[in-house]
Structures are given as structure tokens and as C-alpha cells.
Amino acid sequence: GFLTAEEKGLVNGLWGKVNVDEVGGEALGRLLVVYPWTQRFFESFGDLSSADAIMSNAKVKAHGKKVLNSFSDGLKNIDDLKGAFAKLSELHCDKLHVDPENFRLLGNVLVCVLAHHFGHDFNPQVQAAFQKVVAGVANALAHKYH
């Protein structure tokens, strides 16, 4: 696999402490605030007029929760991310035409949110391992483009 045994240990150790539902909503919300052009995929979600509106939007929270639960499932198949995300890749790429760059942006935002939540526990080694994971997931999601 692309992660060492040690890196897998770091990732799983931290992930076990993550409140997936909460962090998912925060990560997707921040994506929409920090990179406003990503909002065009979520026009049906209602009020996205300000940072506060986005962060408290129930549909954003619900989709963020869904996104991070899928990410969580992917971590269980860390050595076959392409297989784990094949269906979601098809949906986002073929049906929704999401630019794969957005998957990378969301991965980077997720890393920021984890750093924010875990402080000292999110040390450089943990960050490096997670950065590999989010890059791997983004590549798996972009797979249908290649």
C-alpha cells in the first residue's frame, strides 16, 4: 500500500477520535466559504449568502456528514481506494461533472479542520500521513477522468 504500517497506525489512531458527523459538516462548510466557486454544485442547498449562513446550513451539514462517512469507509479499504471510491467517482465525475481539483481542495480543508480540532495531537507526522490519505482519496475520486 502507499502508507507504511506506522502511518496507518497514526491515521487510524487519530481517526478513532474524530466526530465524523461534526467534522464533515465543518469541512464542507469551510470549503464553500474559503473556495466560493465550489458553491455552484450546491445551489439547491438554500442560503449560502454568508459564512454564518453556510456553516449553519442543515443541508451542508448533512452532505458533509455523508462525505466524511464515505471517507471513513474508504479508510477501511486504504489499499484499494480506487475500488472503494469507484461508484462515487462515477457519480461526481460523470453525472455531476465536478472538477477533480475540488476533491483536493476538500482534502486540504479537512486537514485544516483536523489540525484545528486536535491541536498538539495533530503533529507533523500525523499531518504527513493524512496528507497522503487525502491525496490518495482525491486521486481515487478523479479516477474516472483518466
From Swiss-Prot:
Family recorded in the similarity comment: Belongs to the globin family.
* Organism field: Felis catus (Cat)
UniProt keyword Transport present: yes
Task: Kindly indicate whether the keyword Acetylation belongs to this entry.
Answer: yes
Binding sites annotated in the UniProt record for heme b: 63, 92
Q: Which SUPFAM superfamilies match?
A: Globin-like
In-chain residues carrying the UniProt-annotated modification S-nitrosocysteine: 93
User: Globin domain location, by residue?
Assistant: 2-146
Annotated PANTHER family = HEMOGLOBIN FAMILY MEMBER, HEMOGLOBIN SUBUNIT BETA
**Molecular functions (GO terms):** heme binding; hemoglobin alpha binding; metal ion binding; oxygen binding; oxygen carrier activity
> What gene name is listed for this protein?
HBB
Q: What does this protein do?
A: Involved in oxygen transport from the lung to the various peripheral tissues.
UniProt-recorded name of the protein: Hemoglobin subunit beta-A/B
Modified sites of kind N-acetylserine: 1
Q: Which keywords fit this entry according to its UniProt record?
A: Acetylation, Heme, Iron, Metal-binding, Oxygen transport, Phosphoprotein, S-nitrosylation, Transport
- List the InterPro entries hit by this protein, alphabetically: Globin, Globin-like_sf, Globin/Proto, Hemoglobin_b, Hemoglobin_oxygen_transport
Regarding tissue, the record states: Red blood cells.
Q: What quaternary structure, including any partners, is listed in this protein's UniProt entry?
A: Heterotetramer of two alpha chains and two beta chains.
Q: What Pfam families has UniProt attached to this entry?
A: Globin
Identify residues that carry Phosphoserine. 44
Any GO BP: cellular oxidant detoxification
A single Gene Ontology CC annotation of this entry is: haptoglobin-hemoglobin complex
Organism lineage string: Eukaryota, Metazoa, Chordata, Craniata, Vertebrata
* In-chain residues carrying the UniProt-annotated modification N6-acetyllysine: 59, 82, 144
